[in-house]
């Protein structure tokens, strides 16, 4: 679309039992949004022939510890740069060592109260990455993990990719929907101020949460 960088190899899957992925980019329960870069330099866009955004694999695990063997097989087959998992069902009693994958850094946001929920993210060690925390308060009713990615090569003028992995519970209400909408808008504004020309990937299990504002106000596009 107009020479904008694309996000190939993005798989979105929700409500899967057992763990699995689909070749279809979007299905019910899984979405990935990528910011339009707005770059107009034709030379830099032509160079996109030798550049690809990191590939992203998204799945809803419903207890990842019970499906690690399946996860290892999928990772070996797909070789995605980034693996995003919702409903990880991990808690503070679960050490990272139990769910590590070779050649990937692991990041997680566990549910603080009650069973279920939680998000988990694996990033290839070939990509510099670390957790970032926006100075914006978030409701404990949803889990969201922010990770900054600095691939070795990015098309100009992008300086980094801000990845968000989000899980919205199915019982969310109008009040929570408004709070989440406000939170995402504030976080994107925060990161745009903090970093020069960041690109964004927001993915996860949104359930019935309406993401239209991402397209209308933030100029994201659904992949």
Question: Where in the sequence are the language-model features?
Answer:
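A shared catalytic/ligand-binding motif for oxyanion handling
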Residues: 1-223
């Amino acid at each position: 679309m107009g020479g904008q960088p694309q996000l190939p190899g993005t798989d979105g899957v929700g409500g899967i039992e057992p763990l699995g992925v689909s070749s279809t980019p979007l299905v019910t329960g899984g979405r990935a949004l990528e910011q339009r870069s707005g770059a107009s330099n034709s030379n830099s866009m032509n160079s996109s022939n030798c550049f690809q955004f990191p590939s992203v694999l998204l799945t809803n695990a419903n207890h990842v510890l019970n499906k690690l063997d399946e996860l290892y097989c999928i990772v070996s087959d797909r070789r995605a740069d980034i693996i995003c998992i919702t409903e990880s069902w991990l808690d503070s009693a679960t050490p990272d060592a139990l769910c590590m994958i070779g050649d990937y850094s692991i990041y997680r946001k566990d549910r603080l109260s009650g069973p279920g929920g939680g998000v988990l993210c694996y990033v290839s060690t070939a990509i510099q990455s670390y957790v970032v925390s926006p100075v914006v308060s978030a409701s404990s009713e949803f889990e969201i993990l922010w990770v900054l990615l600095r691939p070795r090569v990015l098309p100009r003028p992008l300086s980094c990719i801000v990845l968000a992995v989000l899980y919205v519970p199915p019982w969310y209400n109008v009040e929570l929907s408004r709070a989440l909408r406000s939170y995402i808008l504030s976080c994107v504004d925060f990161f745009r101020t903090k970093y020069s020309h960041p690109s964004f990937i927001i993915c996860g299990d949104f359930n019935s949460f309406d993401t239209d504002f991402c397209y209308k106000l933030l100029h994201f596009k659904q992949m």
